[in-house]
A protein has these predicted regions:
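Phosphate-binding/switch region of NTP-binding enzymes
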Residues: 43-44, 49, 53-54, 83, ...
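Short glycine-biased active-site loop of nucleotidyltransferases that positions the nucleotide triphosphate
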Residues: 72-73, 198
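Gly/Ala-rich phosphate-binding loop of Rossmann-like dinucleotide-binding domains
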Residues: 64
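Charged, amphipathic alpha-helical linker segments immediately N-terminal to NTP-binding catalytic cores
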Residues: 2-15
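Conserved inter-motif catalytic segment of the P-loop NTP-binding fold
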Residues: 7-10, 20, 26-27, 31-33, ...
Length: 247
């Protein structure tokens, strides 16, 4: 029996195993330290109308014009992919980006006229590489899960986010997802995200956007970090929304 067992083991295909000593260490690169890392997936969430999309647009604008993000160093301008399924490109997205000062030649989007985009679509990685994109925004999450995907089922959500995370890692692109919170009251915002808790578990950073209700005269919003798997959490950052966009 022992000989037979050895013979079977010899015929089996070896399992690919690596030694940790063979892994070359790398340093995390940041688009906005410590909020948004390059090569990873970040989630921006909050209740409807609190400024999630405005914040995402402002970040996209800063990336295209090289201006300084709050508490961050100036960056060299680069191309951005902005995918949205909730607002009109011509009447909403472009005017808002303009208010934020975006360089429109650097803001791109994948044309979905013939085929709707999903997280597993191979056009994502191709578009990132072909356009030298370093930031991709998808707004909102549920619009890009794909047909017949139940976002409340962990076994259906995990492969999608694993695939998206792999794209981010291979290309070095920061992928930012916009998510709404559900209507549950009294529960932690981490667990009020739409869908499976695996969504929050799969991303490396979670930013939460909220409106400061006490500030009646000024439209003040605050973004703070709920999760950071890569660095120490930063203090909340306040911004305002007005006729000139985000400040």
């Amino acid at each position: 029996m022992a000989k037979q067992m050895c013979w079977r083991d010899a015929r089996e295909k070896p399992v690919p195993v690596m030694k940790m000593s063979e892994v070359e260490e790398t340093v995390v690169q940041w688009l906005w330290d410590p909020f948004i890392p390059f090569g990873k997936v970040t989630l921006i969430q909050g209740n409807p109308g609190k400024g999630k999309t405005w914040l995402a647009m402002a970040i996209a604008a800063y990336c295209t014009n090289g201006k300084e993000l709050p508490n961050a160093l100036p960056i060299e301008p680069f191309n951005v992919l902005y995918q949205t399924a909730e607002d009109g490109i011509a009447d909403t997205i472009k005017p808002r980006l303009a208010k934020c000062g975006a360089d429109m030649t650097r803001v791109r989007f994948i044309n979905e006229d013939e085929k709707q985009l999903s997280m597993t679509d191979d056009r994502i990685e191709k578009a990132i590489r072909q356009n030298n994109v370093r930031l991709m925004i998808m707004d909102p999450i549920q619009a890009y899960l794909g047909a017949n995907v139940d976002m409340n089922r962990a076994n259906e959500i995990r492969p999608l986010f694993r695939h998206l995370s792999t794209i981010a890692e291979r290309t070095g692109c920061a992928i930012v997802l916009i998510g709404h919170l559900n209507k549950s009251s009294g529960s932690q915002s981490d667990y009020r995200s739409l869908g499976s808790i695996d969504i929050a578990a799969a991303v490396r950073s979670i930013l939460f956007v909220e409106k400061v209700e006490k500030e009646k005269e000024q439209d003040i919003r605050v973004v703070y970090q709920q999760k950071d798997s890569l660095a120490k959490k930063e203090n909340p950052v306040a911004f305002s929304l007005g006729e000139e966009g985000l400040k």
